[in-house]
Amino acid sequence: MRCSAVSLGSGTIINAIATGFGSAFGVDLKIKADVELVDNGKKIINGISIDNPTLKPSLVERCVKNVLNYFEVDYSAKISTNGDIPIKSGLSSSSAASNAAVLATIGALGEKVDSDLVLDLAIKSSFEEKLTVTGAYDDATASYFGGITVCNNMERKILKKDEFKEDIKVIVLMPEFEKNVDVNRMKLIKDYVDMAFEKCIAGDYYKALFLNGLLYSSALNFPSNISVDALEAGAITAGLSGTGPSYVALCYSEDEKNVENALKKYGNTVITKPSTNGARILY
C-alpha cells in the first residue's frame, strides 16, 4: 500500500493572526510525500525528510497517525518528504508538508479523497504540533487548491477563490532576521488589518498585500523599507510573508532582475511564480 502526493507552498496576502480573516496564494514550489503502509497491527510510524535529514519528522508522522486513526486501522507506516520549498521561507512549508502527507496516506489506504477531510486532518496535525496560531486555513487552502484563497480562518470557510490575472513572478527574500511571533502586538493592529482585508475581499490583492506587510512588519519590528525598495526597483507589490522574517515581492518578468538585486542585499532570494495547480496524488 503505497502512494505519493504533492502540495504547494503559499505566500501571504493577509495574515490572519490579528483578525481571524486571511488570504494566501499558491506558488510553484512543492513538497512531495511518499507513504508506505504495512498491515502489521503495530502502529509504528517513521518519517524522514529526504532533502533536509536534520528536520524533525514529527509533523508528517502526526499527519499519518491522524489519518490512520480516522479510518480506524492499526497499520505501521513509513513516510518520506522531499521538495523545493525552503524551510522557514515564509512559504508555508508546514502546510504543504501536512497536506501532502495526509493526501498520500489517504491515497495509500485506497480511500476516497475528500478535500475538507484532508484540510481538517492537516490542520489538526499542525495544531497538535504547535505549528500554528490560527489554524492557517488560508495557507492550507492556497497550498491545497492553488490560486488565491480568501478565508475566515476561525470558521474554516473559504470566502472567495481567485487567481492573479497577470503573468507575474514571485521573488522571496529570506533575510537572517530573528523571528518574532508576538501575538499581542499583532492583535493591536486589528482595525488596520481589517482595512487591508477590505481591499483583499474587493479583489485588490496587490494593495492588500502591501498594506498587510507594512502593518505586520511594524508590529513585529521588521524593516518596512524592504517593501518600498522592491517597489522602487519595479515590483508591483511587496510585503512581509506570514510572520516573517521573509518577504515576498510580485513583479513582471522584465523587472525580475532589478527587484531581485534590490532584495538580495538583505539575504538569500528564491524566484518562483503563482500556481493554480494544487495538491494532487501522483501515483
Curated annotation (Swiss-Prot):
Enzyme Commission designation: 2.7.1.71
Stored Pfam families: GHMP_kinases_C (PF08544), GHMP_kinases_N (PF00288)
GO cellular component: a single term: cytoplasm
Keyword Cytoplasm listed: yes
Molecular function terms, GO-annotated: ATP binding; shikimate kinase activity
Main subcellular localisation: cytoplasm
Pathway stated in the Swiss-Prot or TrEMBL entry: Metabolic intermediate biosynthesis; chorismate biosynthesis; chorismate from D-erythrose 4-phosphate and phosphoenolpyruvate: step 5/7
Swiss-Prot/TrEMBL keywords: Amino-acid biosynthesis, Aromatic amino acid biosynthesis, ATP-binding, Cytoplasm, Kinase, Nucleotide-binding, Transferase
A biological process term (GO) from this entry: amino acid biosynthetic process
Enzymatic reactions: shikimate + ATP = 3-phosphoshikimate + ADP + H(+)
InterPro entries, sorted: GHMP_kinase_C_dom (IPR013750), GHMP_kinase_C_sf (IPR036554), GHMP_kinase_N_dom (IPR006204), Ribosomal_Su5_D2-typ_SF (IPR020568), Ribsml_uS5_D2-typ_fold_subgr (IPR014721), SK_arc (IPR010189)
Subcellular location, record wording: Cytoplasm
Residue numbers binding ATP: P86, I87, K88, S89, G90, L91, S92, S93, S94, S95, A96
Family: Belongs to the GHMP kinase family. Archaeal shikimate kinase subfamily.
Protein name as annotated: Shikimate kinase
Gene: aroK
